[in-house]
A protein has these predicted regions:
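Phosphate-group recognition and catalysis centered on beta-loop-alpha active-site segments
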Residues: 2-304
Length: 304
């Protein structure tokens, strides 16, 4: 009898052990399944996060590319000259910080044949003294400073500082061979021919430069309608730059019909800039780079 009871007890114990083992196994597999599900879910979340990050980066790059392309329509007139003294590193730095990659230089030549950057033919307005650049030696010009202590820049100074990180919209204030030759020397020395839009009020300078730099865009600056119409007939003129009183849809269309880009100067009010954008102007000069780029984003290619 005791033997029978012992067998029963042993059987019960075995049953319980097996049951517990089965239960433990079930728990193990459930935990394993749960763990696998958690890992799969975590991987899915990580993949979603990765895809979202990639989409955000792609969107950021697209926005950055669009902003860059829109800024290409904006020529920073003498740098950010509404905020800093014109044609100084401070003015150029500010324009670039505002999103510009097209900064303007006006070139004058010294008695020593060096190209300096100044809108005026004399240094009086910017430096308060000096006289005509063409009558001053390099050492005399180098001794001059602006009202806030900045030096009068050479074209080579600007190339040294910015290199090929920006485009240079360079106006020759004279079409004489001395200025044109000096310009070529500096451009060739720094290998900048692909970084420049050259502009002049006189066609002869542009014609002379066409021989040396056929692929360099040439901008003819015009102040009256007859000059505008005449400029359209010149094959070496790539861009017609009009004073803003000549900025109109009809002139813009004429330029495009002749295979020329249409440019206007100098636009500073919102209405002027918006008008240029809406009529399809390819570029324009402004003293307010940051505002112009904002308006480009809002109105360029906006069909409403």
């Amino acid at each position: 009898m005791n033997y029978k009871k012992t067998k029963i007890v042993i059987a019960i114990i075995v049953f319980l052990v097996l049951g517990l083992a089965a239960f433990a196994g079930l728990l193990y597999y459930q935990n394993a399944e749960n763990k696998a599900a958690e890992i799969a879910q975590q991987k899915a979340l990580e993949q979603q996060a990765k895809e979202a990050a990639m989409a955000a980066e792609k969107e950021r790059q697209a926005a950055e590319k669009q902003a860059y392309e829109l800024a290409d329509h904006v020529y920073s007139h003498r740098g950010a000259s509404s905020d800093e003294i014109e044609h100084t590193f401070a003015a150029y730095d500010k324009a670039i910080a505002q999103g510009s990659h097209n900064i303007e230089q006006d070139l004058v030549i010294s008695a020593d044949g060096t190209l300096y950057i100044s809108h005026d033919l004399t240094s009086d307005r910017i430096a308060g003294s000096g006289g005509a650049f063409s009558s001053m030696t390099d050492s005399q010009i180098d001794a001059l400073t602006t009202s806030d202590g900045q030096k009068i820049l050479k074209l080579s100074d600007v190339f040294d500082k910015y290199g090929k990180s920006v485009k240079y919209i360079i106006e020759l204030k004279s079409s004489d061979s001395r200025t044109v030759d000096a310009f070529r020397d500096v451009v060739d020395k720094y290998d900048m021919k692909d970084q420049i839009v050259v502009q002049c009020l006189e066609l002869q300078a542009l014609k002379d430069l066409e021989e040396y730099y056929p692929d360099m865009p040439k901008l003819y600056i015009v102040k009256d309608q007859s000059s505008f119409d005449y400029g359209l007939t010149k094959e070496y003129v790539d861009i017609i730059g009009v004073r803003k009183n000549l900025m109109s849809s009809s002139n813009c269309d004429k330029a495009h019909d002749c295979g020329k880009d249409f440019n206007a100067w100098t636009l500073d009010t919102d209405d002027e800039i918006i008008s240029a954008i809406k009529m399809g102007a390819d570029s324009y000069f402004t003293n307010h780079t940051d505002r112009a780029i904002e308006l480009e984003k809002e109105y360029r290619n906006n069909e409403e």
